[in-house]
Amino acid sequence: MLPKKKIKSKKRSVTRLFLAGCGTIVVLLLAFCIWVYFSLFSGQDAIQTSPHYPFKSVEAKEKYLDHYEKRSQKWPVAYEDQMIQTSQGETFVRISGFDDAPPLVLIPSAGATSLLWTQNVEMLADRFKIYAIDNIYDFGRSRNTRPFETPNDLMLWLDELFDTLALENNINLMGLSYGGWISSQYVLHAPERLHKAVLIAPAATIIQLPGEWAWRGILSAIPNKFIMRKVMVEWAFKDLAAKDDAASQTAIDDLMNDAILAIKSFKFKMPIHPTVLSDHELESISIPTLFLVGENEVIYSAGDAIARLNLVAPQIKTEIIPNAGHDLTVVQSELVNTKVIEFLLDPMQSDSR
């Protein structure tokens, strides 16, 4: 049996080791948070004057644009690209479809580009003139020259973009996730310019985003495939990740490769946190609007979101997409495309203004 002094000494050693371990973990977490801030979310003032802005370096710009061009080769239909100049900077627009078809503007999710719609554009371009944009304050080929601080800055950007594209007041507008939130803001801002709107799993908008979304987003900002897949892909895109066919796995690889290279290449800062629309704002939506959500959505409960809309804004058409989560435009692309086309072309879905 050990003497009491030796037992106490051993306990103190274990305690010191435990405290040292905790301290090391805290330091590592703090260092990681500092790295995330300075690597990803640092403000633009220090770099906006550089010739390679919004990229971290000339080399990063060249590597990213080369990758982007190769990925563009997977766009399944013919397209014309335009760089549109506005007072906020320049916006890259990928245009497909027939000139005399009704216009459909596509706004991607945060951290994505116009290439997000690769699985959808073939069906949509048969019926619409597609304007797929790279968000001016996100990854891709667009480049802002002024800061974005309020939703009104985004609205001014879209106003000028639509004016320069000579889009008349019959625009169909569709956005996914963060792009869905931007679309909802524009529905409130300029309903007279829109024909119809489609909100696909819009970030916040209907229900507040969960805290889990935040910490998963931070961890998935680590440019590592294993971490990104475990932390974000298998959570938000679990229906797609569960598929073992080559097309699904290629879609996941493309998604992760795009995101990891963008994280390494860009100085990025999300300018405006997506907000939940008030009951009054939802009630005031007068243009025909479709809300699409996957049954396995993780940013909020699909059932709760539709229940709120049915209660406060029954004029908004709602649809739940089976066997899909936040990946619904990919894992159920044909069904989503069909729902969108039917809604946008349905004469019974008329303006209630």
Region locations from a protein language model:
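Conserved alpha/beta-hydrolase catalytic His-Asp/Glu region
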Residues: 208-210, 225-284
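Short beta-strand/loop motif that positions the catalytic acidic residue
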Residues: 285, 291-293
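Flexible "cap/lid" loop of the alpha/beta hydrolase fold
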Residues: 188, 197-223
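Catalytic histidine-centered segment of alpha/beta-hydrolase-like enzymes
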Residues: 324-333, 337
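Acidic catalytic loop of the alpha/beta-hydrolase fold
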Residues: 296-300
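Alpha/beta-hydrolase fold catalytic core
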Residues: 2-103, 128, 345-353
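Conserved HGGG/HGGXW glycine-rich cap/lid loop of the alpha/beta-hydrolase fold
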Residues: 95-140
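Active-site loop/oxyanion-hole signature of alpha/beta-hydrolase fold enzymes
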Residues: 132-174
